[in-house]
């Protein structure tokens, strides 16, 4: 649904952020990378991303110059820097930067920022009456990065690791030293929905990343863990109030 441009002259950093962060969990299905501000500016002008993550000190065009070039655009910016430099940070703040992170990047901290950002973006879509706004309510329970219960966090992690398989509740909690009834009750108390409901919502969320990649819908159903296409279609309509084919038409 959303797009991000990651700009850093260190390949290991930009590729690391691209691969490690679970972008699909935050509705980002298109991730572009650039090694300097010149490449980033071209990508931003061409694709109009909702988020730009950029280093400050880079060859050819640094982060502050890039910010000057995109100041007129409606995109959010996160600044990365190895330098705890107040003047550079102040320059970024003047350009309405979303946040400022020092390297090495704390991935958990970045995910907290992404969680806040996607809530704002989805709220804006809803207020603007955009056709994909139903995603806001359907996937709201998935946006929280961490819960204050160890067992709940373990179950969520297991769901994200095994949603593509025909996993059951028993499978999800087999490595957790609690009863199935306790796990189900605790999960519902903290998350507000059942484990099975969370699993199915997460599967549908992941399916959105595949709908524009020329897969057959029955192939997508299998890739996200549904044993039958009709179950995929049922849950898709349940959470998004439209069929997969209608979603594809409206997303174009």
From Swiss-Prot:
GO terms for cellular component: cytoplasm. PANTHER family: HISTIDINE KINASE-RELATED (PTHR42713), TRANSCRIPTIONAL REGULATORY PROTEIN HPTR (PTHR42713:SF3). Residues 170-191, 217-240 bind DNA. Residues 153-250 form the HTH araC/xylS-type domain. CDD domains: REC_YesN-like (cd17536). Phosphorylated by HptS. The keyword Transmembrane does not apply. This is Transcriptional regulatory protein HptR. Pfam families: HTH_18, Response_reg. Keywords: Cytoplasm, DNA-binding, Phosphoprotein, Transcription, Transcription regulation, Two-component regulatory system. GO terms for biological process: phosphorelay signal transduction system. Residues 3-118 form the Response regulatory domain. Its main location: cytoplasm. It comes from the Bacteria. It comes from Staphylococcus aureus (strain bovine RF122 / ET3-1).
């Amino acid at each position: 649904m959303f797009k991000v441009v990651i700009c850093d002259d260190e390949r290991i950093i930009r590729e690391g952020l691209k691969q490690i962060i679970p972008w699909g969990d935050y509705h980002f299905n298109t991730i572009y990378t650039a090694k300097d501000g010149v490449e980033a500016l071209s990508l931003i002008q061409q694709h109009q991303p909702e988020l730009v993550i950029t280093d400050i000190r880079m060859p050819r065009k640094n982060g502050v110059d890039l910010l000057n070039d995109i100041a007129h655009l409606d995109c959010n910016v996160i600044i990365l820097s190895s330098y705890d430099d107040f003047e550079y940070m102040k320059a970024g703040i003047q350009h309405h930067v979303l946040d400022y992170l020092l390297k090495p990047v704390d991935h958990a901290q970045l995910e907290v920022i992404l969680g806040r950002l996607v809530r704002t973006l989805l709220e804006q879509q809803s207020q603007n009456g955009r056709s994909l706004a139903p995603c806001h309510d359907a996937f709201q329970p998935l946006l929280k990065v961490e819960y204050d219960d160890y067992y709940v966090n373990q179950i969520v992690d297991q769901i994200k690791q095994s949603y593509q398989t025909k996993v059951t509740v028993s499978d999800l909690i087999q490595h957790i030293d609690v009863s199935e009834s306790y796990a189900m009750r605790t999960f519902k108390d903290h998350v507000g929905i059942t484990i099975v409901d969370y699993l199915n919502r997460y599967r549908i969320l992941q399916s959105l990343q595949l709908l524009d990649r020329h897969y057959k819908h029955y192939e997508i159903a299998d890739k996200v863990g549904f044993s039958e296409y009709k179950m995929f279609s049922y849950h898709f309509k349940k959470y998004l109030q439209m069929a997969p084919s209608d979603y594809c038409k409206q997303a174009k």
